[in-house]
Curated annotation (Swiss-Prot):
The gene is rplV. Transmembrane segments: none annotated. SUPFAM superfamilies: Ribosomal protein L22. It holds the Pfam family Ribosomal_L22. GO terms for biological process: translation. It comes from the Bacteria. This is Large ribosomal subunit protein uL22.
Length: 112
């Protein structure tokens, strides 16, 4: 049985979020949450929040035993990009792309 949660339109770069997501995939939920708690990164806190939501969904909706859950998938997809300009010298401007992410966490019962 699986349980999942997702957060959409999160203002964090997908590339940076994927670095953190790959660290917790395949680990037990308890170990993954400890890794995320002590990772000094904005995306770690966001993934931790989504993981807590998936854990609550598993406990409340699917009635799963939270001690046996593992992190099956952490999917980070690219959301919309906000485009901004930064004024530069001599009347020029450069593009700034403020990227966003859609983050999904899937927990399942099973062995590590």
């Amino acid at each position: 049985m699986e349980s999942k949660a997702c957060a959409k339109f999160i203002r964090v770069s997908p590339r940076k979020a994927r670095l953190i997501a790959s660290n917790v995939k395949g680990k037990t939920v308890e170990l993954a949450m400890n890794i995320l708690k002590f990772t000094p990164n904005k995306s770690a806190g966001i993934i931790l929040g989504v993981m807590r939501s998936a854990l609550a969904n598993a406990e409340h909706n699917a009635k799963l035993d939270v001690d046996t859950l593992i992190v099956k998938e952490v999917i980070v997809n690219e959301g919309p990009t906000w485009k901004r300009f930064m004024p530069r010298a001599q009347g020029r401007a450069t593009h700034i792309r403020k990227r966003s992410s859609h983050i999904s966490v899937v927990l399942s019962e099973g062995q590590e």
